[in-house]
């Protein structure tokens, strides 16, 4: 946990600076509800084999990572293993939410963002910064979408990308389509 995390990651506090995020989050969540079971994994995802090994044990994955490398690893592992992925991302005053499901003719994260993104000013996500309230809104939307998927209720976000502009207080929804040349889910990959 770093001081710069505190304004946008409310699960951590000042006393947690220097601790592993996974430990800090588990401690906070257990303090909120001591009856829940939390399974932690103290690893940094930096290899596809590692991501697949971790993700293989779950039915649904929520990704809220703050860097493109991890987002790609999580996406690729979910696609390869056929696991539903609910992905939320934020940068500056904007957020986006999408769901990928196995068997759905919908775009995966890599289809929509084939190259590691940057802002108009050429800054990475960490350099551009994040307005803290945007993470709260996107986290709530992500949790709602994940629960809908697990319970099989409501309309799935699969095949759509939701974008939120906090400065304009405007949501936009666009239909997405898989990229047949996508290295994660494209036609050549699927045919094997």
Where are the language model's segments positioned?
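Adenine nucleotide-associated cytosolic modules
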Residues: 1-192
């Amino acid at each position: 946990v770093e001081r710069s995390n505190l304004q946008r990651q409310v699960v951590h506090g000042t006393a947690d600076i220097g601790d592993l995020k996974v430990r800090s989050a588990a401690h906070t969540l257990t303090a909120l509800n001591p009856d829940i079971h939390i399974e932690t994994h103290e690893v940094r995802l930096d290899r596809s084999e590692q991501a697949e090994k971790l993700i293989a044990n779950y039915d649904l994955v929520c990704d809220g990572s703050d860097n493109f490398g991890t987002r790609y690893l999580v996406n690729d592992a979910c696609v390869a293993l056929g696991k539903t992925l609910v992905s939320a991302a934020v940068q500056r005053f904007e957020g986006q939410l999408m769901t990928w499901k196995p068997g759905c003719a919908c775009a995966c994260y890599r289809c929509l963002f084939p190259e590691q993104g940057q802002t108009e000013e050429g800054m990475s996500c960490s350099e551009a910064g994040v307005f803290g309230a945007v993470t709260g809104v996107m986290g709530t939307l992500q949790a709602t979408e994940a629960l809908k998927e697990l319970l099989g209720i409501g309309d799935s976000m699969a095949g759509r990308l939701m974008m939120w502009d906090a400065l304009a207080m405007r949501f936009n929804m666009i239909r997405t389509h898989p990229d047949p040349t996508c290295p994660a889910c494209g036609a050549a990959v699927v045919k094997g």
